[in-house]
Amino acid sequence: MRIILLGAPGAGKGTQAQFIMEKYGIPQISTGDMLRAAIKAGTELGKQAKAVIDAGQLVSDEIILGLIKERIAQEDCAKGFLLDGFPRTIPQADGLKEMGVAVDYVIEFDVADDVIVERMAGRRAHLPSGRTYHVVYNPPKVEGKDDVTGEDLVVRDDDKEETVRARLGVYHSQTAPLIEYYGKEAAEGNTKYLKFDGTKQVAQVSADIEKALA
């Protein structure tokens, strides 16, 4: 079962990725993790990537696709894998296709921008412990204070409204066209496209996914 997850930052992809991995016993392939592992291992692609990163450049699609090809050839991917955060652009999706990587399911989590902003902007964090709260969905016992230590909670830079809206802008310009791309692929019978309402309760979304993949 080879799966690609699509959805804006804050749409709940990470939570559902965890569910899919555990339920179906397939690994999640994160391009960031792959890059770090290849650089640490000193592989040929890792050396190329390190040189590019050290020069302050973006790693090319060619290197990323090469890393994916190596990763999915490993034994733990025999039953399938989950791609999260890749492809982000049409050329990357074309690259996967040209490599002969068949995708069984493309899963999109649909959440309106304003809902995502509310979700992210309402987050509060206790940085020393990593504990997180939400002013609406998971509030601390005392407003603005960590439940365990009583220390102040903060809004991480990543969760500030202007940062969230900027990231959403990048998503809509770069990644949203993939929705149309994979819609066409599904119409041609090359993959199955599944769309879920990401505003539902986490357990309900998981149940909907399980039913659709059965």
UniProtKB/Swiss-Prot annotation:
Protein residues bound to AMP:
T31, R36, Q57, L58, V59, G85, F86, P87, R88, Q92, R156, R167
Positions that bind ATP: G10, A11, G12, K13, G14, T15, R123, T132, Y133, K200
**The enzyme's E.C. designation:** 2.7.4.3
Q: What is the catalytic activity of this protein? A: AMP + ATP = 2 ADP
Chief subcellular location equals cytoplasm
Q: Which residues form a coiled coil?
A: none
What are the boundaries of the region LID? 122-159
Q: Where is this region: NMP?
A: 30-59
Q: Name one GO biological process term.
A: AMP salvage
- Could you name the domain of life of the organism this protein comes from? Bacteria
Q: Where in the cell is it found?
A: Cytoplasm
* Molecular-function annotations in GO: adenylate kinase activity; ATP binding
Listed InterPro entries: Adenyl_kin_sub (IPR006259), Adenylat/UMP-CMP_kin (IPR000850), Adenylat_kinase_CS (IPR033690), Adenylate_kinase_lid-dom (IPR007862), P-loop_NTPase (IPR027417)
User: What are the UniProt keywords, alphabetically?
Assistant: ATP-binding, Cytoplasm, Kinase, Nucleotide biosynthesis, Nucleotide-binding, Transferase
Question: Which pathway, per its entry?
Answer: Purine metabolism; AMP biosynthesis via salvage pathway; AMP from ADP: step 1/1
Question: Which is a Gene Ontology cellular component entry for this protein?
Answer: cytoplasm
- Describe the subunit structure: Monomer.
- Please give the family membership noted in the entry: Belongs to the adenylate kinase family.
Tell me the function of this protein: Catalyzes the reversible transfer of the terminal phosphate group between ATP and AMP. Plays an important role in cellular energy homeostasis and in adenine nucleotide metabolism.
The free-text domain remark for this protein reads: Consists of three domains, a large central CORE domain and two small peripheral domains, NMPbind and LID, which undergo movements during catalysis. The LID domain closes over the site of phosphoryl transfer upon ATP binding. Assembling and dissambling the active center during each catalytic cycle provides an effective means to prevent ATP hydrolysis.
Instruction: Return the protein name.
Output: Adenylate kinase
Organism in which the protein naturally occurs: Vibrio vulnificus (strain CMCP6)
Per the UniProt record, the lineage of the source organism begins with: Bacteria, Pseudomonadati, Pseudomonadota, Gammaproteobacteria, Vibrionales
Gene name per UniProt: adk
